[in-house]
Curated annotation (Swiss-Prot):
Entry keywords, A to Z: Cell membrane, Lipoprotein, Membrane, Palmitate, Signal
Membrane topology: Lipid-anchor
Location, primary (coarse class): membrane
A cellular component term, taken from the record's GO annotations: plasma membrane
Lipidation (S-diacylglycerol cysteine): C33
Residue positions of covalent lipid attachment, annotated as N-palmitoyl cysteine: C33
Organism: Mycobacterium tuberculosis (strain ATCC 25618 / H37Rv)
Keyword Glycosyltransferase: no
Protein name: Putative lipoprotein LppA
Family listed: Belongs to the mycobacteriales LppA/LppB family.
């Protein structure tokens, strides 16, 4: 069965939940399978170009390992923030829909999701919102850890009592500290090959994922 398609991490939290719900509905309607492709990008490369791109990415390691590293970094940031700001706590988001979205990752630009994905760390939820000064402390910690990944381009859309955000990107990575009704930390990584693709010999395309029949099989 084809894995669920990753959800864009640029969507707000509630829109990601709606998108995941719609995927579940479509899965039921077509007999338990969801289409997992990215036609806008996968058509840009020939088969030989895909092979060359895949082989050039092999030394980066796997998507699964990269996701573990990012989640470890999210934990480091959250621990540092909690230690620096008295009374602050944190936990990984326990919403099953968000957890599923994080596990699925985000789409790459030139390879379909059955070949490569962008890892998403487990989402961090802080126990309390930040004051203006505390948000600066947290953002500085995010900045320091993001720089270790080569992410140094900073931006912010809003900085007021009701809404604050800090975003830093670079080298294919994005770290985002966001506060609206509650404060969260989200980290998205560069594009990495799935482990099952790394396990295949170089110089060839992975086999096409199977598409199961949509009609029920008699027992």
């Amino acid at each position: 069965m084809i894995a669920p398609q990753p959800i864009s991490r640029t969507l707000p939290r509630w829109q990601r939940i709606v998108a995941l719900t719609m995927i579940g509905i479509s899965t039921a309607l077509i007999g338990g399978c969801t289409m997992d492709h990215n036609p806008d990008t996968s058509r840009r490369l020939t088969g030989e170009q895909k092979i060359q791109l895949i082989d050039s990415m092999r030394n980066k390691g796997s998507y699964e390992a990269a996701r573990e590293r990012l989640t470890a970094t999210a934990r480091i940031i959250a621990d540092r923030v909690s230690a620096a700001i008295p009374g602050q706590t944190w936990k990984f988001d326990d919403d099953p829909n968000i957890q599923q979205s994080d596990r699925n990752g985000a789409l790459c630009d030139k390879l379909t999701a059955d070949i490569a994905r962008r890892p998403i760390a487990n989402s961090v939820m802080f126990g309390a919102t930040f004051s203006a000064e505390d948000f600066k402390i947290a953002a500085n910690i995010v900045r320091e850890e993001a720089a270790k990944y080569g992410a140094t381009t900073e931006s912010s859309l809003f900085n007021e009592s009701a809404k604050r955000d800090y975003d830093v990107q670079g080298n294919g990575y994005e770290f985002r500290l966001l506060q609206i009704k509650f404060a969260t930390l989200n980290i998205t990584g560069d594009c990495f090959l799935l482990q099952k693709v790394l396990d295949l010999p170089a110089g060839q395309l992975p086999p096409e994922p199977p598409i199961w029949p949509t009609t029920s099989t008699p027992h």
